[in-house]
C-alpha cells in the first residue's frame, strides 16, 4: 500500500516534469521560425532603418569617392586600350572617342546611382518572396498537446523507469533546441548583415562595369546581390518543407520518437538554412 503511494507520487513528479519540459521545449524554436518569414520578407531599409541610413551615409561619403577614383583609372586604361589596339594609331578612328565618351557617361551613371540599383534588386526579390509567402509558409509551431492527443494518459500508463528515461531525454532535447534556436538566429541575422556589408561597398565593383577587361568584377557583384536576394526565397521554401514534415508527426504513438523526430526535423531545418546561401550563389554563378 505504501509502496503504491510512493510509486504514484514519484510518477506524478516525473509526469509533471515531463509535461513542463515539453510545454516549453520548442518555444524558442517556434518563436525563431515564426520570425523567419518577417525577417526575410523585409527589405534592408525596412529591417533596420538605423543601420540602413548609417551605411548609406558611409557609402555616399566614404566609398563613393574611392569608386570615382577607380572609375577614372578604369576609363583611362580603357581609352589607352582602345587607342593601342588600332595598330598604334595607324588605323585611327575618331568614332572611338564617341564610344569612349558614351561608355564613360554610362559608367558614371551606374556609379552615381549605385544605391538605387542595389535597392531595386532587393525590392524585386522581396516582392517575389512576399508573393510566395502565402503559398509556401504553413503552420510551423510545434505543440505536443496537438501532435500527441492524450499525452498525459500515455504518460500515466508508463512505468517509473520509462518516465525517468523520458524525463532525461526531454532535458537533453531541450538543451539542443536552445542551441538550434541560436543557429536559426545566426542564419537570418547573418544574411541581413551580409546584405548591408555588400551594399555599402557597391560603388567600388560597379565602377569597373565600363571596362571590357575588368567588368567581370561588377558582373559578379550583381550576381551576388541576386543570390542574396533570392536566398530569402530558398529560406521560405525550406521553412515550408519543415512545416509539412512537422505536421506528419501528428498522431504519433511513441512520445520519445515524436520528441526526437521533431528535434531531427529542426536540425535538418538549421542545416538546410545554412546551405541556402551556397545554393543560391551556385544557381546565379556568384563567387
What label would you give each PLM region?
Residues 1-70, 83-95, 105-176, 215-220, ...:
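Gly/Ser-rich, low-complexity
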Residues 64-77, 195:
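Hydrophobic alpha-helical transmembrane segments
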Residues 73, 118, 122-125, 183-186, ...:
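Membrane-embedded alpha-helices of multi-pass transport/permease systems
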Residues 77, 187, 191, 228:
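Short alpha-helical basic/polar micro-motif
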Residues 100-103:
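Elongated alpha-helical scaffolds
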Residues 164-215, 233, 237-243:
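Hydrophobic alpha-helical transmembrane segments of integral membrane proteins
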Residues 224-236:
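Alpha-helical transmembrane segments of multi-pass membrane proteins
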Amino acid at each position: 500500500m505504501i509502496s503504491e503511494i510512493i510509486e504514484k507520487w514519484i510518477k506524478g513528479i516525473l509526469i509533471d516534469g515531463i509535461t513542463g519540459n515539453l510545454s516549453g521545449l520548442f518555444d524558442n524554436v517556434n518563436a525563431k521560425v515564426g520570425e523567419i518569414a518577417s525577417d526575410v520578407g523585409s527589405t534592408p531599409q525596412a529591417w533596420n532603418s538605423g543601420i540602413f541610413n548609417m551605411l548609406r551615409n558611409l557609402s555616399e561619403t566614404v566609398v563613393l569617392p574611392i569608386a570615382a577614383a577607380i572609375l577614372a583609372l578604369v576609363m583611362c586604361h580603357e581609352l589607352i586600350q582602345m587607342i593601342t589596339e588600332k595598330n598604334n594609331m595607324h588605323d585611327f578612328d575618331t568614332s572611338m572617342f564617341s564610344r569612349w565618351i558614351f561608355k564613360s557617361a554610362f559608367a558614371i551613371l551606374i556609379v552615381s546611382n549605385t544605391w538605387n540599383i542595389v535597392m531595386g534588386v532587393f525590392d524585386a526579390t522581396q516582392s517575389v518572396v512576399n508573393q510566395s509567402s502565402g503559398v509556401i509558409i504553413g503552420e510551423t509551431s510545434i505543440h505536443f498537446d496537438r501532435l500527441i492527443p492524450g499525452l498525459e494518459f500515455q504518460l500515466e500508463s508508463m512505468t517509473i523507469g520509462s518516465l525517468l528515461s523520458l524525463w532525461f531525454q526531454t532535458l537533453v532535447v531541450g538543451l539542443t533546441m536552445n542551441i538550434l534556436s541560436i543557429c536559426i538566429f545566426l542564419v537570418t541575422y547573418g544574411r541581413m548583415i551580409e546584405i548591408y556589408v555588400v551594399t555599402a561597398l557597391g560603388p567600388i565593383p560597379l565602377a569597373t562595369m565600363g571596362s571590357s577587361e575588368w567588368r567581370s568584377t561588377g558582373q559578379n557583384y550583381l550576381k551576388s546581390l541576386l543570390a542574396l536576394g533570392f536566398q530569402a526565397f530558398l529560406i521560405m521554401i525550406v521553412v515550408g518543407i519543415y512545416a509539412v514534415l512537422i505536421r506528419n508527426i501528428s498522431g504519433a504513438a511513441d512520445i520519445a520518437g515524436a520528441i526526437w523526430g521533431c528535434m531531427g526535423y529542426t536540425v535538418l531545418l538549421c542545416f538546410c538554412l545554412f546551405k541556402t546561401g551556397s545554393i543560391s550563389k551556385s544557381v546565379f554563378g556568384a563567387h
